[in-house]
Amino acid sequence: MKQWFIDQSTKHPKRSIIVSILLTMLMGSGIQYFVIEDDFMKMLPQDIESMVTWNELKDEFGSTDLMFLGFGIRGEDALNSKTLAVLWDLSRALEGVAQVDEIICLSTSDKMESDDGFLEVSALQEYRDLDEADIAILRAYLDGNPKIKTRTLGSNGDYLNVMVRPLVGAKNDVLVRDLEQVVETYLSDYDVHWGGQAYLTGALPLLIRTDVMMLMRAGLIGMLLILLFSFRNIPSVGMVLATIVLSMVFMFGFNGWMYHLTGSDAFLFGMLNTSMPIILLTIANSYGVHVITKFFRKMRSNKDTRLAVEASISSLLLPIFLAALTTIAAFLCMVFAPLESLLGYGISISAGIAWAWLLSTIFLPSILVLKKWDPDSSAVSHASHFERFVLVFGDHVIKRPKTVLITGAVVVIIGAVGIFSLNIEVNMKSFFKPTNPIRQSLDFMDTEMTGSMDLQLLINADLRSPEVLNQIVSIQNFMESHKSVTLSISIADVIKQMHRMVNEDDPLFETIPDSREKINNLFTLYSMSGDPEDFSSLVDYDYKKGLATSMMRSISTSDVVILVDEIESFLQKDEFKDLNITITGMLIVFRDLVALIIRSSFISIFASILIIALIAGYFFKHWIWGILAIVPLTAAVILNFGLMGIFGVDLNHVTALLSAIIIGVGVDFALHYINQFRTLLRRHGLEGDISRETMQDVGFPVILDAASNMAFGALLFSEFIPMVHMGGLMVFAMVSTSMATLTLLAVLLELSKKYLARIEGITVA
């Protein structure tokens, strides 16, 4: 099999290149079916308990996840004829947007008034154009009904609040785009702020992908410049780039074909897939760097291109194959992930890795064979400054193995301690820097409006019972006592307002009536001039199931957990034992989702490490080699997650995927080092300096690979904090995986070489 691969590039290079390109184009034709999905909700698992409850709630009450729009002019009273006329036009235009179910604001809300003991229900803003007298009446009504005022008007009175209720199943990304187009038309003269989890899930994926793709291009350019500095040869850099590009085309085409053939949403390219091209790029670059550096070393000794290529592939075929196989196995462990999109992620990137392996062992060597190389050129005949530095570094490591081992162990232990300080955070507000316009809008909504989050309580009880309704009032009062909750709304508030109005608008009667009959009478009075369907978002037709919604300021994930625990503890009181209440909403889904992602990520990491150890042990013919292969990988994983805890880098559904990069690159370094060490051990026994020779042969490509991939530290300049963290962690991942290989693994092999020689059947004196 090894000879077949060698023959493809040394005997049939042109055919190999043409076939590789044609097969890439064939698979790449699937790009026509490649679908980018910016609807964040598509990635949510439908079978977790909180999601099932939330879906049931939406089926009964419609969408509960609102978008918030605040607009006005700072310091100018929003209750003026011009602004109210704009609100009138805007609300009707927004109602005409395809995926909007309801617009809640001053111009769409109703008011209740007393009329000789009867309820008179009419529009809160009756006309588009209001005069000063009309505005005075409106202002007085809002002052007398603080909950309505809080819901529709900013705390300083200079901004109006508009709530958008999407249709169930609406695509938030499309809806956000359509809403922003309408707002741009009507509110060009006003300061505009958006908020709400629904808005963020619609706006964020496209923003992140656009930002990352731009920075990825910068990272790619940086990577190529580092390679050029090290190789000192433009064609060799172009060869690595060609391998990367063809691998990318193959992966995206494969993804498109899989979606076309299966129709599965797992193969939609969403926000979580944004890291796929970065990971494949680093892996394809790694394979290419090893081939080019090995080729240059062989050219220095034999001066013959074909012989150099043959020797390079003969030496690298097994380690690159094992690196690809173990990395693919690691990514296929994503089948344990709770998200369908991660299943497609793992399968698609595995296809890209497999193709990168074939290209690096057939396509790339074929180009090397056809290129006319000058054996006396500096790129071929002389080691670069970078390469000489690595040799000096390696000598220091090998001369002080115990010191290096102890130092490395201490660093890893410190990292392990840091893991216990990891903070899980998925509040999307924390994704933005304080200077970002979206972050500033969210801050505005939190400080001056009703907030940018909401939480729902699904109540199963007799909602015409005075006792039950008073219990709901108590629960709402408890909710509103929390500093993050700005407003709580339920059917109990409507009943209290009706009770007040039929009693001559006396605030003393803003209470729950003391009998079921009185409550039934209130609904009867309302139906005479109002529509009972007005309550459909608060209570079901039979008044057996209701919804209490709390508007909230943005809080962290840990604070969400604390708040939910406090609510659950409060509901355990005896007075609420007859109520069946479920806490639900997108906040709860996100809380559970992140817990699932984090748990599945760690399961995937452990499964990957185990599989890598088994595969390496099998191919190297002893389990001890498998254990040694995962030493750098395990150390790097511990260090990265530990330092995240130490430096306060949040763990979320973006940074949790960092482990995939560590595994993809870390295992490659270790397998190359072990393969070369084992080859020299079998060839020379314990004679000579095996560790130094291994370091000379493998150290430079490992460091060059890591250094070139560090160019993706360009993500540090992202507008999004998780991407900034990922950029920094990626740089550190390159450092940790390469250093762990060239220090911990190197000294372990050096210290145990006699034992390893016995394993290989070599006589040890």
Model-derived regions, located:
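Hydrophobic, glycine/alanine-rich multi-pass transmembrane helices and their short helix-loop junctions
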Residues: 226, 321-363, 613-616, 639-650, ...
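Solvent-exposed, non-transmembrane loop/terminal regulatory segments of multi-pass membrane proteins
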Residues: 33-78, 84, 130-152, 165, ...
